[in-house]
Regions:
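Amphipathic alpha-helical "stalk" segments
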Residues: 1-145
Length: 145
């Protein structure tokens, strides 16, 4: 089974789980995703799969979760989320936790690499902390103006 086909199956699982958890917000995300052509969706899913593989490769090459190379890949993942919805820092944090701790997500990433769920989840947590810090700093600057 191709990785893209695997990703499509996971997307179906995401849809079901998302509607249960987030209701209307999830439904609007699904509507956005379904507005793309099949070719557009395939390209997005292929790019996402490739990004996961690169993260796993970097991990095996000894890169740490906070390395510039890994964080660039997490930034790319963050950008890819916009194909589905606008991800808040909280959503990003929650996704990282879900990838590590929830079996349906963990199983998907383990198929790419058994160590990927923990590494990717930790990398996402680090990225989210950086985003949160930058946001707080921007708010402090605004208050000083």
């Amino acid at each position: 089974m191709s990785k893209t086909k695997n990703t499509k199956q996971v997307m179906d699982q995401y849809e079901t789980e998302a509607i249960k958890r987030w209701g209307e917000r999830a439904e609007s995300s699904i509507e956005l995703w379904k507005s793309y052509t099949n070719d557009q969706r395939d390209l997005v899913l292929q790019a996402m799969d490739e990004n996961y593989k690169v993260i796993a490769q970097l991990m095996h090459e000894g890169a740490s979760m906070d390395s510039p190379e890994v964080q660039e890949r997490v930034r790319i993942w963050h950008e890819q989320l916009y194909y589905f919805y606008e991800p808040s820092i909280e959503i990003i944090e929650n996704l990282g936790n879900m990838y590590k701790n929830e079996s349906e997500f963990r199983n998907y990433y383990e198929k790419i690499d058994p160590e990927l769920p923990d590494f990717f989840g930790d990398s996402i947590a680090y990225y989210a902390d950086i985003l949160a810090t930058k946001w707080i700093e921007s708010q402090v600057l605004q208050l000083k103006e």
